[in-house]
């Protein structure tokens, strides 16, 4: 949640922030929020005065008898009714104020490139050589079916469209990828978690999981306040809710494994087929909690770890600095890694990492105490160590052979014990 003091002192900063994010200024009416805040403070002052009067009268009642006492009792009763009425108005104003503050996006980093949408994202780096095939490369779904690695047909029969079974060597690849991530990040001091796949809606809302458009929303559990998590960022982010951490313990570096569930409503088309957009997948998530002055460095650090993993897999990729108009609400700045996917003939997103500064920490009330005694909000960052479904696409398509077989990346062979997947059909 945004600090109301900043809005009071300079509301134009948020107005500009909303425009730069390509959001509707009318939906995020900053002037109205300022009015609500002023009204709340005015009501609070009035309530304080009335309560002071009532307390004074209550003290006087015991000092008087007869008519004077009855008169004071009546005055106290009238004040009580006024206070109750005013308190209700105050509660309504405060509720609307916090609701509107809750919807405001985070302040952009000055370093985030300005732009309207994904077309304005800035490529800042490329790594690896794109392989030239002497045959027409297949896409991952054709390869997966040829090698009996997925079953969408039975997944649809059992659960619904865009659900699937991973099979045979694809299962080994999932666990191998997780082991590669663990062996890469454990020496860096990360603590390992397997998180719940469900979270309370207050935690999901606190993280600010508000994807742009209808294509990635939360599954709700009927008759509960629970939702299936779309990322372990949600459960790792909520881990320290309402806590005050010690400065000397920061940064906290967490690696969380979970299933991820997304409704992906409206996500159709050639490039969304197969494993690219599915309702359920497994993911390892990097999550760091740090001091405000360290978050930019930690952001680059997470990106470096993500790059290290894909370099070990020897998959060509590029890094994008996401523009202001393509950022989600919590992120002040975000980097995406897009791997080369020969089957579609273009790069496709495989990881992202976001610096959410104090946005999530304010919403979840996570603070730290400096050695000097001051208490401040922490900064929180997240990144994809590996998203299995996207990683499998990149592996299948980059390591395919003319006969449809798939080579196993050298970095994964020790975990699997084989060097090649052969067609079974």
UniProtKB/Swiss-Prot annotation:
ATP binds at residues 262-264, 278, 349-352. L-serine binds at residues 231-233, 285, 384. GO terms for cellular component: cytoplasm. One of its GO terms (molecular function) is serine-tRNA ligase activity. It is found in: Cytoplasm. Consists of two distinct domains, a catalytic core and a N-terminal extension that is involved in tRNA binding. This is Serine--tRNA ligase. It comes from Dictyoglomus turgidum (strain DSM 6724 / Z-1310). The gene is serS.
């Amino acid at each position: 949640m945004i600090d109301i003091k900043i809005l009071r002192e300079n509301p134009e900063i948020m107005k500009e922030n909303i425009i730069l994010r390509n959001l509707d200024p009318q939906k995020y009416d900053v002037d109205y929020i300022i009015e609500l805040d002023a009204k709340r403070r005015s009501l609070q002052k009035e309530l304080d005065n009335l309560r002071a009067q009532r307390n004074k009268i209550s003290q006087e009642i015991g000092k008087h008898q007869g008519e004077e006492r009855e008169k004071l009792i009546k005055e106290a009763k009238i004040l009580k009714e006024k206070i109750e009425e005013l308190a209700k108005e105050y509660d309504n104003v405060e509720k609307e104020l916090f609701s509107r503050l809750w919807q405001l996006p985070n302040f952009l980093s000055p370093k985030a490139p300005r732009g309207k949408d994904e077309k304005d994202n800035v490529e800042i780096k490329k790594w690896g050589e794109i392989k030239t095939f002497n045959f027409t490369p297949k896409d991952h779904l054709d390869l997966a079916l040829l090698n009996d690695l997925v079953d969408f047909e039975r997944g649809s029969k059992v659960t619904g469209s865009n659900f699937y079974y991973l099979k045979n060597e694809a299962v080994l690849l999932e666990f191998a990828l997780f082991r590669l991530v663990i062996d890469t990040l454990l020496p860096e001091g990360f603590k390992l978690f397997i998180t719940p796949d469900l979270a309370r809606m207050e935690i999901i809302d606190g993280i600010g999981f508000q994807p742009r458009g209808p294509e990635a929303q939360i599954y709700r559990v009927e008759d509960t306040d629970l939702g299936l998590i779309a990322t372990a960022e949600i459960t790792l982010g909520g881990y320290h809710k309402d806590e005050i951490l010690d400065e000397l313990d920061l940064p906290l570096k967490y690696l969380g494994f979970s299933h991820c569930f997304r409704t992906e409503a409206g996500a159709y088309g050639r490039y969304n087929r197969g494993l690219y957009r599915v309702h359920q997948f497994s993911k390892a998530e990097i999550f760091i909690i740090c001091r405000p002055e360290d978050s930019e460095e930690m952001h680059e650090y997470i990106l470096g770890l993500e790059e290290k993993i894909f370099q070990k897999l020897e998959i060509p990729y590029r890094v994008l600095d996401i523009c202001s108009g393509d950022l989600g609400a919590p992120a002040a700045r975000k980097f995406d890694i897009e791997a080369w996917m020969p089957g579609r003939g273009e790069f496709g997103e495989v990881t992202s990492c976001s610096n959410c500064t104090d946005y999530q920490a304010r919403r979840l009330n996570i603070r730290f105490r400096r050695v000097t005694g001051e208490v401040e909000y922490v900064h929180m960052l997240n990144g994809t160590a590996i998203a299995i479904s996207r990683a499998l696409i990149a592996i299948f398509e980059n390591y395919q052979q003319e006969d449809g077989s798939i080579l196993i990346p050298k970095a994964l062979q020790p975990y699997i014990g084989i060097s090649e997947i052969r067609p079974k059909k």
